[in-house]
């Protein structure tokens, strides 16, 4: 399930809640937004490689299980099948229902079932650094704050021949 595939799910939730829908051109007022980058919440490939070896944090991969388990090809050509050694799989689609995060009890149960310790540091990853943010949002909802993003994600790791991959082929 990609972010694009999830749009109908979110739209179904919007319609279910009877929120307004319209068609036509959209004109938005101009506005200002000052973005700030916090480098401490983004991990680089070398950081993730060290964590994979030393187990100082948990790597949580948000991709669907068939991709994580090397049972399905990646949507991006040239990427290996599999996952970062030691990573845990929490597919982002399991965390939402009809476009909304599941309840905190459901979220907690999902992370627990997948072996994620909510009291240890977590690095979230996925295919391209986008859907990992759903994992980060779910963790924030549970009050988990020691969470970072590996935005290079599988599109970076899976393209390299010099990095370990599980399951080993």
Model-predicted segments: where are they?
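Single conserved hydrophobic/aromatic residue that forms the stacking wall/gate
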Residues: 1-5
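Rhodanese-like catalytic fold shared by cysteine-dependent sulfurtransferases
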Residues: 6-58, 62-169
């Amino acid at each position: 399930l990609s972010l694009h595939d999830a749009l109908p799910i979110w739209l179904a939730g919007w319609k279910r809640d009877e929120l307004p829908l319209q068609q036509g051109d959209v004109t938005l007022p101009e506005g200002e937004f000052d973005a700030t980058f916090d480098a401490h919440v983004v991990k680089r490939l070398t950081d993730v490689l060290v964590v994979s070896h030393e187990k100082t944090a948990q790597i949580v991969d948000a991709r669907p299980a068939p991709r994580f388990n090397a049972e399905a090809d990646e949507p991006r050509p040239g990427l290996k099948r599999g996952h970062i050694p030691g990573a845990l799989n929490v597919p982002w689609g399991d965390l939402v229902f009809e476009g909304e995060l599941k309840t905190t009890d459901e979220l907690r149960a999902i992370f627990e079932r997948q072996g994620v310790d909510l009291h240890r540091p977590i690095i979230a990853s996925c295919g391209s650094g986008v859907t990992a943010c759903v994992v980060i949002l779910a963790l924030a909802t549970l009050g988990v704050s020691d969470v970072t993003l590996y935005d290079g994600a599988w599109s970076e790791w899976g393209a390299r021949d010099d990095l370990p991959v599980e399951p080993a082929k």
